[in-house]
Amino acid sequence: MSSFAIAEKVVDIFPSTETTAPIIYLNTFSGEGQKIYEAARAANYPQFTLVAISDLGWNHDMVPWDSPSAFKNADPFTGGADDYLRLLTEEIIPTAEKEIKGVPSWRGILGYSLAGLFALYAIYQTDLFSRVGSMSGSLWFPGMKEYIFSHETKCRPDCMYFSLGDKESKTRNPLLRSVRQNTEEIQAFYQGKGIDTGFQLNPGNHYNHAVERTAAGICWLLSR
């Protein structure tokens, strides 16, 4: 593993020894990149390089526009995804890919929770990613489903993976209650366009087995 820092973000690279191995970009909540990498590698799927970014402004960097907080006494969302995506595409990706040997066969982006929301938003702004994973993605976020249905991606993804805990929508919170319906409708929307999509409903709530669920998303993308 090697690491570097850009604009107060910490970037950890878990490299493959294969020169054409795909590269996957993962935005993390609390620096869980190594655990996710080890869990995915243990599953004996094809080799890959993981680039995990941490120290993010979670409620700013991962969201596309401003929105009130989804929780009582929590900070509001302040849309900083465009600025962070510019940092990712113009600085983080070029720096990371100078550190690895060879040229990746494909480039993917995925994330959990708000990072899953960001992964989807990213493909509407850049054509750098051909595979996408949104695990327990915050697809309840106000306006996101409508944005997806009314805009075109910058390039057609090769495949897209979605997963959700089966208890995530069972809440009194009216925003979060929509997450399963929104996720299923969004997955069906992409599937209807002929894109290879997967949807996995896992037992548990939003906070159960995040590492394992994220690793499962990586493995699904690698299996296509």
Give the positions of each predicted feature.
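A short loop-to-beta-strand scaffold at the N-terminal edge of the catalytic core in hydrolase folds
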Residues: 2-17
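Serine-hydrolase catalytic machinery in alpha/beta-hydrolase-like enzymes
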Residues: 10, 20-99
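A general structural motif
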Residues: 20-22, 47, 104-106, 129, ...
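A conserved amphipathic alpha-helix that caps or lines the catalytic cleft of carbohydrate-
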Residues: 40-41, 123, 187
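Short beta-strand immediately N-terminal to the catalytic nucleophile in serine-hydrolase-like folds
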Residues: 106-111, 135
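Gly/Ala-rich beta-loop-alpha elbow adjacent to hydrolase catalytic centers
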Residues: 110-115, 119
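Conserved hydrolase catalytic core segment
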Residues: 121-131
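The feature captures the conserved acid-bearing segment of alpha/beta-hydrolase catalytic domains
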Residues: 139-221
